[in-house]
């Protein structure tokens, strides 16, 4: 906590990737800029102020006392369609959002990095390189013992129904549950287990992604992987949790409440309509830049120097936006020569990873 307080007191820009109590509660110096780069892609399960006084959410009194999600200068979103939902969740005006994506989107689409991760996975689990297609099952966490038991039973059913003549099955449990991965190849009795990679990592070797109510769907979309929704407990889960989008009609995925249906979809090569996939991807995970991370670097520098012009803000940015260096290269040569570079600024950036809300994952 004291380390965070020092960061807020001495930094020009603070970058968060989750809920930080001190960011919201403290009275900061006027020139401090706080950027919230929320850790989950897309807008799916309701969270934050959208679920106040509801099951799984905080109370209104707690939110008011802790000034939940206050003091943000800018808030990142992975696509334009996320902004109205995030505005509700954070209790912030839409004009404060920058729908330019988040750095994780670079990782998901970096071919060299993905090849490196794939190599590491196959080194650890060489049985996944046996010529068969790999199915990744990455369910979200469950809150109660009853729900966790139901998930365990559904997972066992999927393990039993998989056709190991044609497929391998990777089960990656949510970090809130066990974080374990289980690799099934020749049969359900032939299993390797560990805790070495994330679900996002396993997408580097996956051919199909099976999930339920997880933002994994957005990660799979960026990698152009077919998505299947194994919604064995949908009646209960949807009633209790709530979604920003229509669970049954908006997602570019195929649905089944039983494992056989999921396995049949995959075996027959069925996937969602490609036009629906592309439309949804552009709305919720629109990768406008080759390097989103580089754009954040420039944005942070401009905020620290007090020269950010608002070009990335919601309602201003468009799909034909150019990276800043391309805009600068289009300027007249004599203007570039007559305008010396600004002196270097030593920007202190504090990244918070200690206090996060996991509701959306």
Model-derived features with residue positions:
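Donor nucleotide-activated moiety binding/catalytic core segment of transferases
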Residues: 2-9, 175-218
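Conserved catalytic-core segment of nucleotide-activated headgroup transferases in glycan assembly
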Residues: 97-183, 256, 316
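Short active-site oxyanion
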Residues: 12, 70-75, 168, 205-208, ...
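C-terminal amphipathic helix plus adjacent low-complexity
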Residues: 113, 259-260, 264-334, 338-342, ...
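A donor-sugar binding/catalytic signature common to diverse glycosyltransferases
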Residues: 14-20, 25-28, 33-38, 196-241
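Catalytic binding pocket for nucleotide-activated donors in carbohydrate/polymer assembly enzymes
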Residues: 215-284
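Active-site and donor-binding regions of nucleotide-sugar-utilizing enzymes
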Residues: 1-112
């Amino acid at each position: 906590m004291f380390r965070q307080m020092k960061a807020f007191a001495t930094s020009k820009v603070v970058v968060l990737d989750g809920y930080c109590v001190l960011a919201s509660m403290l009275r900061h110096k006027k020139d401090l800029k706080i950027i919230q780069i929320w850790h989950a892609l897309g807008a799916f399960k309701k969270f934050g102020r959208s679920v106040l006084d509801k099951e799984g959410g905080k109370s209104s009194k707690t939110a008011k006392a802790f000034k939940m999600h206050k003091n943000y200068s800018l808030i990142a979103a992975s696509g334009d369609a996320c902004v109205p939902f995030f505005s509700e969740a954070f209790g912030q005006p839409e004009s404060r959002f920058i729908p330019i994506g988040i750095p994780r989107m670079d990782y998901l689409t970096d071919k060299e990095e993905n090849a490196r991760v794939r190599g590491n996975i196959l080194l650890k689990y060489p049985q996944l390189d046996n010529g068969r297609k790999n199915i990744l099952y990455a369910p979200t966490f469950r809150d109660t013992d009853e729900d966790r038991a139901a998930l365990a039973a559904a997972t066992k059913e999927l393990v039993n129904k998989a056709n190991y003549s044609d497929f391998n099955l990777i089960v990656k449990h949510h970090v809130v549950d066990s974080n374990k991965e289980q690799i099934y190849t020749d049969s359900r009795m032939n299993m390797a287990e560990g805790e070495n990679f994330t679900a996002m990592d396993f997408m580097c070797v996956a051919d199909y992604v099976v999930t339920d109510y997880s933002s994994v769907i957005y990660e799979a979309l960026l990698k152009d992987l077919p998505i299947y929704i194994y919604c064995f407990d949908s009646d209960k889960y949807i009633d209790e949790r709530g979604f920003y989008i229509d669970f049954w009609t908006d997602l570019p995925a195929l649905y089944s409440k039983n494992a056989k249906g999921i396995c049949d979809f995959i075996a027959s090569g069925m996937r969602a309509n490609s036009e629906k996939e592309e439309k949804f991807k552009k709305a919720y995970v629109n990768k406008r830049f080759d390097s989103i991370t580089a754009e954040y670097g420039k944005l942070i520098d401009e905020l620290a120097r007090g020269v950010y012009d608002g070009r990335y803000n919601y309602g201003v940015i468009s799909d034909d936006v150019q990276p800043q260096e391309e805009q600068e290269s289009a300027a007249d040569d004599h203007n570039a020569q007559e305008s010396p570079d600004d002196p270097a600024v030593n920007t202190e950036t504090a990244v918070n990873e200690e206090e996060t809300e996991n509701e959306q994952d």
